[in-house]
Every structure is written in structure tokens, then in C-alpha cells.
Amino acid sequence: MADRLHAALAVLPERLGWHVALSASALALGLAIALPLGVAAARSPRLKWIALGGAGLVQTIPSLALLALFYPVLLLLSGVAVKVFGHGFPALGFLPSLLALTLYSMLPILRNAAAGVSGVDPAVVEAARGVGMTDRQRLWRVELPLAAPVIMAGVRTAAVWTIGAATLSTPVGQTSLGDYIFSGLQTEDWVAVLVGCAASAGLALVVDGLLGLIEGGVARREPKRLWAGGAGLVIGLLAALAPWPARRYRKGGPPMSSGPRTSPSSTSWPN
């Protein structure tokens, strides 16, 4: 058992780095899309109905099915890109995982952004309008600051969802902490399964706690909590990714192995 634990921990920095990179990228992309869409939805009931309905529909699709769904889509688009531009892009690995997790992260951010902006006291908005603020000034100086605690709660939920769902990216060729779980189940290596579950749960708890500090700092107007949470996230991100650039891509390899895998239509990864 000690040998298995040592072997599992030896590849933890690589798998944790990939897991953090994937989760952070998906969350950042989801935030960049869902936040402006949520603000716009708060001003348009029709757009709000369409946006929340679409994001809710995505949530009804099981995470693993959503990840797998992008493989044939990207395979088709890659074939078209080869004919048009002369080169394609990976249909397995980081790209489909990123797209699926981005969609999966959008609902809580979108819902809370729309609810937060809509919930701002109309009297406050009218007072801002009365002192001559433009629509943009009201948004940035009044509405978004007041809605920030609600929005941060959505980001916090989305982060935990994304970290958990990222463990399911292993079957589509992306290295993550899920490699421990899937390979351990295949080989009945319960030490690997335990390490994967503990690492992913621990990561989710740490991120949730740090985002909770930021949420509390925003809600209570306490800069110390805000900076403590932000600094913790930055330090944690850098610590997780520090050994990651030194790792080289591994081409091919057996299913559920460490390192990104490629599809026949994808471009070649560096050796």
C-alpha cells in the first residue's frame, strides 16, 4: 500500500496542475460570457427567459455526456478546418473539456448576475440618474457594486461545480485528478481512487473557502477579507501551476494514462 501511495503522490503535481489549469480557464471563460449576459438579461425579460432557459437546459445534460458530446462536434469542425485552412485542432483533450466545463459553469453566474442587478433598489438607481449619471456610470458605480455579493455567490458555486466536473474529463483525453479515479477503478487500485477523491474534494474546499472570504469582504465592505481571499487564490494558483510548465506533453499512451491524448484529426502535440 505504501508503494501505491508513493506512486500516486509522485504524479500529483502534474495532475493537480492540469486540473487547476482546466478549472480556472473554464471558470474565467464562463465568467467572461455569463456576467455581461446576466447584466443584459436583467434589463430584458425576454433575454432573461432565453438565457436562463438555455443555461438550465445545459445543466440537465449529465457532465460526462456533455464532455463526450463535444468530441464528434469538434471532430467534424476540425475536418472542415483542415479542408479550409490546411490544419485542424484537437477533438480530444483540453479543448472539449474547456468548452463543456465553460457551459457547465455559466448557469449560477448568469442567474446570480441577473438576480443581483435586478434586485438593486430602484430608488437608488433613480437617485443616481437624478445626479446626472449615465447608464454606464450607474452600472459600474451603483448597480454592480451593490450586486457584487450576489454575483460572487454565483461564482463560488460555479467554481465548486467546475472543479468537481473536471474530474470527468479523463475519458475525453484530458489529464486531471480524475485520472486517479478512473484508472484506479479499472485496476482496482483503491489507493489511487482515494487519492483522487481526496485531492479533488480538498481543492474544491480550499477554493470555496477563499472565494467565501472574497464574498464576505465584498458584502461587508472589508478590504482585508477581500485581499486575503484574492491573495490566497493567486498564491494557490501559482503553487499548483509552478511544476506544470516543466512537464512535457506525452503523445499517445494507454487509456486513462497521464498526459493529454490526441485524436486522428487533431494536430500533433510536441514530443
What are the residue ranges of the model-derived segments?
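Transmembrane alpha-helices
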Residues: 24, 136-168, 191, 195, ...
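Periplasmic/extracellular loop-to-transmembrane helix junction in inner-membrane transport proteins
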Residues: 1-26, 140
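Short cytoplasmic-facing helical segments at TM-TM junctions of multi-pass membrane proteins
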Residues: 109-155
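Loop-to-helix entry region at the N-terminal start of transmembrane alpha-helices
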Residues: 11-22, 72-108
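Cytoplasmic-entry segments and transmembrane alpha-helices of multi-pass inner-membrane transporters
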Residues: 37-72, 101, 111-118, 225-230, ...
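Short, well-ordered beta-strand elements
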Residues: 252-264
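Hydrophobic alpha-helical transmembrane segments of polytopic membrane proteins
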Residues: 177-213
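Transmembrane alpha-helical segments of polytopic membrane transport and secretion proteins
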Residues: 1-6, 10, 209-248
